């Protein structure tokens, strides 16, 4: 019997990068060598957001996923995981692409933190102005 075909994909969000390895299996998802529930501290809404491309296509139990995520915080990492999963699932089965694209999961979210400008406290916050 031939070994299961592995597909790699990369997803990004803010400063986070997620590398996903997907292959046919039983639905086991690991993130940085931990179960996804342990890595995302059992927060159901965040876990559901991360695996939305799989639940949209109803294939949560058909593929094993091994993810490596670096950089950023929780929101960025979840967005990067979602982006990587969407790309990987489209590479493994091209017929899934229209449904995933329609939901916007293949589009890299371009929003980044705005840089701090000199003379200001933050990116846009200046010093308080007193008229008198």
Swiss-Prot record:
Domain of life: Bacteria
GO biological process: translation
Pfam families assigned to the protein according to its UniProt record, in alphabetical order: Ribosomal_S9
Alphabetized GO MF terms: RNA binding; structural constituent of ribosome
Keyword match DNA damage: no
UniProt similarity note: Belongs to the universal ribosomal protein uS9 family.
Record PANTHER family: RIBOSOMAL PROTEIN S9 (PTHR21569), SMALL RIBOSOMAL SUBUNIT PROTEIN US9M (PTHR21569:SF1)
NCBIfam families to which the protein is assigned, alphabetical: PRK00132.1
HAMAP family reported for this sequence: Ribosomal_uS9_B
Protein name: Small ribosomal subunit protein uS9
Species of the source: Leptospira interrogans serogroup Icterohaemorrhagiae serovar Lai (strain 56601)
């Amino acid at each position: 019997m031939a070994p299961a075909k592995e597909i790699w994909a990369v997803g990004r969000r803010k400063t986070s990068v997620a590398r996903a390895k997907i292959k046919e299996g039983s639905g086991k998802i690991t993130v940085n060598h931990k179960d996804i529930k342990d890595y995302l501290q059992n927060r159901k809404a965040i876990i559901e957001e991360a695996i939305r491309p799989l639940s949209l296509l109803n294939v949560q139990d058909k593929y094993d996923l091994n993810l490596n995520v670096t950089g950023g915080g929780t929101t960025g990492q979840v967005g990067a995981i979602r982006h990587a999963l969407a790309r990987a699932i489209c590479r493994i089965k091209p017929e899934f692409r229209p449904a995933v694209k329609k939901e916007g999961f293949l589009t890299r979210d371009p929003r980044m933190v705005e840089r701090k400008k000199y003379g200001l406290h933050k990116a846009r916050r200046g010093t308080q102005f007193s008229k008198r």
